[in-house]
Structure formats: C-alpha cells, structure tokens
Amino acid sequence: MEYFDMRKMSVNLWRNAAGETREICTFPPAKRDFYWRASIASIAANGEFSLFPGMERIVTLLEGGEMLLESADRFNHTLKPFQPFAFAADQVVKAKLTAGQMSMDFNIMTRLDVCKAKVRIAERTFTTFGSRGGVVFVINGAWQLGDKLLTTDQGACWFDGRHTLRLLQPQGKLLFSEINWLAGHSPDQVQ
C-alpha cells in the first residue's frame, strides 16, 4: 500500500503549457511501458490529450467547469463532475473548457490487451472487490483505510488484496478505481 497527498506530489508541466500532471502510481512501478497508470491532471487551457497507443483512458472531472471532449466523428461528450468517461487513448481527443476556468481530473489508463479499470464514486463505507490493483482519492470527508486516516486530496494505491474504506463522518465522497487483469495475464508475471 502506498499513500499520497496531492498537495505534496511533484508536478510535471505539459509541453504545450496547457496543464500539468501529478502521477499517483504506475504498474509495474517506475516503468515507462506501464500496464496501468493513475494520475491527476490540472487543465488550464483547451488542447489535446496525449496519445497512448493500445491504452484505454478513463477520465473523471474532480473540480472546475465542465469539459467538452471531442474526437472527430467518434464522440462529443460533456464531462461532468464525478462521472467517469472511458475512451481509447490512441485517438485524438480535444478538451475544451466550457466555463473558461481551470479543471482538475483523475485519469487512469490501462493496456487494453492486459487489464481493465473500473472507476466509481463512493459515499459510504465499502470493501474493494479483491482486485489486483487500485487507487482511492478522497474528494471530501474523512475515511479510514487500515490504520491510516485519509482526508481531502489524500489517497492510496495498492497492487493486491481487499481493502475496507470506512467513512468516519455523516457525509463524504471518494473516487476509487480497481484494476482487473484479463485472462492469461497476471501482475505476478511482470514484477
């Protein structure tokens, strides 16, 4: 289990100066050719998402104005807060800030031939499904994960097992993503 605080994470500026990324974790760790990666991006201007051939991207708006996602004749989608949206990361997708203000989103990318991610929003205590990887990010409230207290803008990343996240207040919201490996693939093969 690895814990993180978004306010203390290193920031990578985009080459096009339209935003920045905070990488949460990758699997395998510290590998350029990852099977899955979780990150948080701040988008300050209209622009295109980076291309990642053979990957699926699930993006979830965390804060800021809605964002219009356009991909030629494939889709036009308005990204609304806390509603995950998946698309192939090897297609050109343009992001337009509809309110003209900076947006922050959670991204998870998976290799299509190896694993699949699901992204959900939780507002009550729950136990993960025992996947072979996952990430949680606290949007608000106080949550207990094992012996660790997680609050707004904090989270955790794991590579195996079931985990219970206990809401400690009457209200709270967190984003969580779990990774499931496709038949014939296992994280044990790449570590």
UniProtKB/Swiss-Prot annotation:
Cited SUPFAM superfamilies: RmlC-like cupins
Family that this chain belongs to: Belongs to the Ves family.
Matching Pfam families: HutD (PF05962)
Domain of life, source organism: Bacteria
The keyword Ribonucleoprotein is annotated on this UniProt entry: no
This protein's record includes keyword Flavoprotein: no
Keywords: Stress response
Transmembrane segments: none
Record InterPro entries: RmlC-like_jellyroll, RmlC_Cupin_sf, Uncharacterised_HutD/Ves, Uncharacterised_Ves
Organism name: Escherichia coli (strain K12)
Protein name: Protein Ves
Gene Ontology biological-process annotations: cellular response to cold
Conditions for induction: Induced by various environmental stresses, including low temperature, osmotic shock and oxygen. Expression is induced more than 10 fold by reducing temperature from 37 to 25 degrees Celsius.
HAMAP family associated with the record: Ves
PANTHER family recorded: PROTEIN VES
